[in-house]
Design a protein with these regions (language model features):
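Phosphate/nucleotide-binding beta-alpha loop and adjacent structural elements of enzyme active sites
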Residues: 1-261
């Protein structure tokens, strides 16, 4: 980020030091970062309107720190192409919109989430952005998709409509996606069922980054599946440090040599 922007944030950290030390979080300083800000990632500079993101619940700059500075989805990549992206677990569309900016004017980004957030202004704006498609879908594995009882067990606790159940393969078929340059996954534990079933759709994916919820399942299973389908795989814990595969918090995989050595 620009030096002046960094100094703004460091100044906010000093002003809110007592709160930051008490909460052990930088949120108090993050809330002072408003307006359009610039970030540098993978060789390019991006401008982001933090106030627009703050229309969602939560702290916009805190997430931008994770995305651009800690680079939670990109820290193990040396280069990535974003021409066609798939965002599984897109929520209100913040990551989807950032991926679209990274993809450029001709890029296409598809986001999937079980909720539509009808009152969220940021999501509404994202939906109207050329090159972005948001799909309401409850992601699941093929075995659950074909088992009505299992589908209700998965959906009912969250109030999800079983009619919106969809596999990754079906998402790709729905939108004619023959090739995905970058796949981001954050689906709150549902990733284990998706990778446990048939994963032929991975043949059409170059690079992927995912947040993996190791309290729900064993990340080593996903890592093995990725390796079996031809991916080079790396993983880190939630804080970004090397860890054994069972305790992975983030997984990064490439089929085209995009990971750092």
């Amino acid at each position: 980020m620009p030096k002046s922007q960094a100094l703004r944030w460091y100044g906010a950290v000093l002003r809110h030091a007592p709160t930051i030390l008490r909460e052990r979080k930088f949120y108090a300083a993050d809330r002072e970062m408003r307006g359009k800000l610039s970030f540098f990632l993978l060789g390019s500079t991006f401008s982001v309107d933090v106030d627009a993101i703050n229309s969602t619940s939560g702290n916009g700059y805190a997430f931008l720190r994770e995305f651009f500075i800690r680079q939670i989805y990109f820290r193990e990549f040396k280069h990535v192409n974003f021409d066609t992206c798939l965002d599984l677990g897109c929520n209100t569309g913040v990551v989807t919109s950032l991926l679209k900016q990274m993809a450029g004017p001709q890029g296409k980004v598809y986001g999937v989430d079980p909720l539509t957030y009808p009152d969220n202004t940021f999501r509404a704006k994202t939906c109207a952005t050329p090159g972005i498609t948001l799909h309401q879908g409850v992601l699941c594995g093929e075995s659950v998709r074909l088992d009505p009882a299992a589908l209700h067990v998965m959906c009912n606790p969250y109030g999800f409509d079983t009619n919106h159940a969809i596999t990754v393969k079906e998402v790709m078929e729905t939108y004619g996606l023959k090739h995905i340059d970058f796949l981001k996954i954050d689906i709150e534990g549902a990733e284990f069922a998706i990778f446990r079933d048939s994963a032929l759709w991975l043949d059409n994916v170059d690079n992927l980054a995912m947040e993996v919820h190791n309290s729900v399942g064993n990340p080593a299973e996903i890592i093995l599946r990725l390796e079996q389908t031809g991916f080079q795989v790396k993983w880190l814990d939630d804080a970004g440090y090397p860890v054994d595969s069972r305790h992975a918090g983030y997984i990064y995989a490439s089929k085209i040599g995009s990971l750092k050595e």
